[in-house]
Amino acid sequence: MRASNYHINTLKEAPADAEVASHQLMTRAGMIRKLAGGIYSYMPLGLKVIRKVEHIIREEMNASGAIELLMPVVQPAELWQESGRWEQYGQELLRIKDRHQRDFVLQPTSEEVITDIARNEIHSYRQLPVNFFHIQTKFRDERRPRFGVMRGREFTMKDAYSFDRDEAGAGRSYDIMFDAYHRIFRRLGLAFRAVAADTGSIGGSRSHEFQVIADTGEDLLVFNPDSDYAANIELAEAVSLLTERARPAEALQEVATPGAAKCEAVAELLGLPLSQTVKSIVLATESEKDGVQIWLVLLRGDHELNEVKVGKVPGLQNFRLATEAEIVEHFGCKPGYLGPIATAKPVRIIADRTVANMADFVCGANRPDFHLRGVNWGRDLPEPELVTDLRNVVAGDPSPDGKGTLAIQRGIEVGHVFFLGTKYSEALKATFLDETGKPALMQMGCYGIGVTRIVGAAIEQNFDNRGIIWPRAIAPFEVVICPVGWGKSETVRNKSEALYQALREQGIDVILDDRDARPGVMFAEWELIGVPLRVTIGDRGLNDGVIELQGRRDTETVKISVDSALKEILNKLETL
């Protein structure tokens, strides 16, 4: 490709609404242009990257035995109503009507459609197992689309769905996809982790996320550097350091804490470590049978509540935060000074494991500007109704596998695999006839990869103050040839053309910048775009029989012989 025949339109400044590096750099490099909130046009450079990502995914999916098809973006509401997700999915599901006033959705995912295909196409155990996949546009009506292609409303995903005769077969299909995903992300040139994860709205009983490691990631990944243990922080179990509660050493006393409504302020005022305080979080549930039920969740002052874990507590599946009126009614006090002793009305008390092991702790007195210190279970208040893991782990916590301690890093989710079981096949009655001629439900798995999200995540992991640093496998071009003096020197033009043709013959994706731009402008533009390897050809070097190479991550150029240039470039590419 010649730059003079290609669309390259870089910008000096990023748009004001671009919050993260990938959004800023993709816009400045001319890879995307915003059409509406969370909706982007992919310009030639950006689309080229996407196509390379898709190519790697498609190759590995084919190698794993998956079969490609294509399902529609527009799906009838009846399927979503049949699965129960028409109401469950929430406002992210964009609902539309056709001219006949029939309800449809713009697909955010395709479990319903693929299950409908399976129930109509698969009738016998002889047709199983099978794994279908497609790469398709999706739409989720995000309330606040942000971060460019990282959290857009319209995006591209690869979805695969496996169908098996039994749970054992579904487990094998899951493992095949799990391994295929490792191959995909390794080929993409990304540093990543596969972590155990919550199944979320998709459902199912087994799940792993594939997370690209990046300091700007929204997700917290918990792992053991000394073992294979890794999990999303939502799922990581917090193992209590203490096995036996200490004996009481203080008397219960009420202390004035004027204006200290936060645990941090209370600890500072009383001269105590934050870990000696207990925070009170008031939740509510509603049911036709019991009406509104108020729950008091107790957490150590230096810990954070894990809402996924709370949602798995029996009775708290559909919890919400209690209103201030509900809090005052049940505690006789506004938030900030709440505690489990002497509530105005009965509440259900559940405690994190760490809190249940505490002695002589500090909590709210259910009286404005007062707290209780020297509080002890059994002596000053009954043992909690339920003790369970309710908190996020912190770095240094014991690893759940018993092999050392945990570390935490940030990541960006780019892939997710789920074992679904019969969640959708049962809802949509997707059955097959087994060996005995009896109908049985298909066991399902689903496996997603965010194609456009990978592009953003790759940049978040690979950039500097000059621009993008693409992994070679997905760079828009592998090599850029930058002739210095293109319009003045026939020798420069001839050598540049010869090297350009030689690289093309070797199958290298190369672009020749024949626009006759000034060297500084030319170099800065290609550093912004992020091409992995730059070759500079000028009269001064040619007079000495050399040209210059510089990898995008390199700080210095390397002079190489003109005669061995092709070999040197190919060798350098192998290291990128």
Swiss-Prot record:
GO terms for molecular function: aminoacyl-tRNA deacylase activity; ATP binding; proline-tRNA ligase activity. Signal peptide: none annotated. Its EC number is 6.1.1.15. The keyword Cytoplasm applies. InterPro entries: aa-tRNA-synt_IIb, aa-tRNA-synth_II, aa-tRNA-synth_II/BPL/LPL, Anticodon-bd, Anticodon-bd_dom_sf, Pro-tRNA-ligase_IIa, Pro-tRNA-synth_IIa_bac-type, Pro-tRNA-Synthase_IIa_type1. It is found in: Cytoplasm. GO terms for cellular component: cytosol. Keywords: Aminoacyl-tRNA synthetase, ATP-binding, Cytoplasm, Ligase, Nucleotide-binding, Protein biosynthesis. Pfam families: HGTP_anticodon, tRNA-synt_2b, tRNA_edit. GO terms for biological process: prolyl-tRNA aminoacylation. It catalyses: tRNA(Pro) + L-proline + ATP = L-prolyl-tRNA(Pro) + AMP + diphosphate. Belongs to the class-II aminoacyl-tRNA synthetase family. ProS type 1 subfamily. NCBIfam families: PRK09194.1, proS_fam_II. Catalyzes the attachment of proline to tRNA(Pro) in a two-step reaction: proline is first activated by ATP to form Pro-AMP and then transferred to the acceptor end of tRNA(Pro). As ProRS can inadvertently accommodate and process non-cognate amino acids such as alanine and cysteine, to avoid such errors it has two additional distinct editing activities against alanine. One activity is designated as 'pretransfer' editing and involves the tRNA(Pro)-independent hydrolysis of activated Ala-AMP. Consists of three domains: the N-terminal catalytic domain, the editing domain and the C-terminal anticodon-binding domain. Homodimer. This is Proline--tRNA ligase. It comes from Bordetella avium (strain 197N).
